From Swiss-Prot:
Belongs to the FKBP-type PPIase family. FKBP1 subfamily. It catalyses: [protein]-peptidylproline (omega=180) = [protein]-peptidylproline (omega=0). Residues 26-114 form the PPIase FKBP-type domain. It comes from Candida glabrata (strain ATCC 2001 / BCRC 20586 / JCM 3761 / NBRC 0622 / NRRL Y-65 / CBS 138). The gene is FPR1. Signal peptide: none annotated. This is FK506-binding protein 1. The lineage of its organism: Eukaryota, Fungi, Dikarya, Ascomycota, Saccharomycotina. GO terms for cellular component: cytoplasm. One of its GO terms (molecular function) is DNA-binding transcription activator activity, RNA polymerase II-specific. The keyword Transcription does not apply. Inhibited by both FK506 and rapamycin.
């Protein structure tokens, strides 16, 4: 199942979560993710590091595409977020890693809402 939300962020649901525990603005979330460019080049992965990532969602700590997309997932859900440049790193990109205005693809698993 696929849906497109705010900012053109596309959510492809890969496996369901509990269907009832969704993060709200300001919640601390624990996520496993792998980020790739459209050409398939991996630029970051919490899975490879063996350490899940934590952030407060919806408060500007992460890219806008995560702030928009992660609250649509329930705990345990796996999804692919396709995030257009303006909702990723925008015109600055991330020097040496992510080109300016690049669309990013994240395979994410919402492990926990704290």
């Amino acid at each position: 199942m696929s849906e497109t939300i705010e900012g053109g962020v596309k959510i492809d649901r890969l496996s369901p979560g509990d269907g009832k525990t969704f993060p709200k603005q300001g919640d601390l979330v624990t996520i496993h993710y792998t980020g790739t460019l459209e050409n398939g080049q991996k630029f970051d992965s919490s899975v490879d590091r063996g350490s899940p990532f934590q952030c407060n969602i919806g408060v500007g700590q992460v890219i806008k595409g995560w702030d928009a997309g992660i609250p649509k997932l329930s705990v345990g859900e796996k999804a692919r977020l396709t995030i257009p440049g303006p909702y990723a790193y925008g015109p600055r990109g991330f020097p040496g890693l992510i080109p300016p205005n690049a669309t990013l693809i994240f395979d994410v698993e919402l492990l926990k809402v704290n």
